[in-house]
Regions:
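A short beta-loop-alpha structural element at the N-terminal edge
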Residues: 39-62
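A conserved beta-turn-beta hairpin within the catalytic core of GNAT-like acetyltransferases
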Residues: 20-23, 112-121, 130, 149-151, ...
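A conserved beta-strand-loop-helix scaffold within acyl/acetyltransferase catalytic domains
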Residues: 64-78, 84-118, 122-125
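A short, internal acetyl-CoA/4′-phosphopantetheine-binding micro-motif in the GNAT/acyltransferase core
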Residues: 2, 123-130, 157-158
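Conserved active-site tyrosine of GNAT-family acetyltransferases
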Residues: 10-12, 168, 173
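Conserved acetyl-CoA-binding loop-helix of GNAT-fold acetyltransferases
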Residues: 125, 131-144, 165-170
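Conserved GNAT acetyl-CoA-binding A-motif
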Residues: 1-3, 117, 146-157
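Acyl-donor-binding surface of acyltransferase catalytic domains
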Residues: 1-46, 179-184
Length: 186
């Protein structure tokens, strides 16, 4: 629900829905400068196990982990399957990975929204390797290799995920909208 539509929010809350997340959508309308890193490449079928393992543990700020009625185990499994769906052709147009000593330490899953826009669907960096510029490098790689001229990258993240918001601001992303994410369990 768009964050400016409080009337709609209240309506759904009266139906038993509750807020689990406040989401910020951002966009980048310029190409990034290429950052050379020989460990960054497009994913290959053999990367699935490493990507799934990272996805299982990397996500803390999301609507599944925030929902008190969804167990931590289930929330982690959802993200693992979400990332794994790239390899079965069910979700994602591209996946960029960072490999170090034969281990996947980062991945970026992208979908095509329309002919001018790609969306960062998932992005994760192994906890031990955060703060080293790997997310920036993967986004740069995607910008150079997945975007045509005059195309846009969009991303959504949780307002509680201040690290991601700081990264996107540093890279030149601008806020385009915000919304509430609601769940209802029966």
């Amino acid at each position: 629900i768009p964050s400016g539509n409080i009337k709609k929010l209240v309506y759904f809350q009266k139906l038993g829905f509750y807020v689990v997340d406040s989401n910020i959508q951002l966009s980048l309308t310029k190409k990034m400068i290429e950052i050379k890193n020989t460990n960054v490449r497009f994913a290959e079928p053999g990367d699935e196990k490493g990507v799934r393992a990272l996805a299982r543990v990397a996500f803390k700020h999301n609507r599944f982990n925030s929902d008190p009625q969804i167990s931590k185990k289930v929330a982690c499994k959802i993200k693992e399957e979400w990332a794994g769906n790239y390899f079965s052709g069910k979700r994602g147009r591209w996946m960029v990975v960072v490999e170090y000593k034969k281990n996947i330490i980062g991945f970026l899953q992208l979908i095509r929204k329309n002919y001018k826009t790609i969306v960062i669907d998932l992005i994760a960096v192994d906890k031990k390797n955060r703060g080293k510029g790997l997310a920036k490098t993967m986004i740069s790689y995607a910008s150079i290799n997945c975007l045509g001229s005059h195309e846009v990258i969009e991303v959504g993240t949780q307002i509680a995920n201040t690290e991601s918001l700081a990264l996107y601001a540093k890279l030149g992303f601008s806020i385009i909208s915000s919304s509430y994410v609601l769940h209802r369990h029966q």
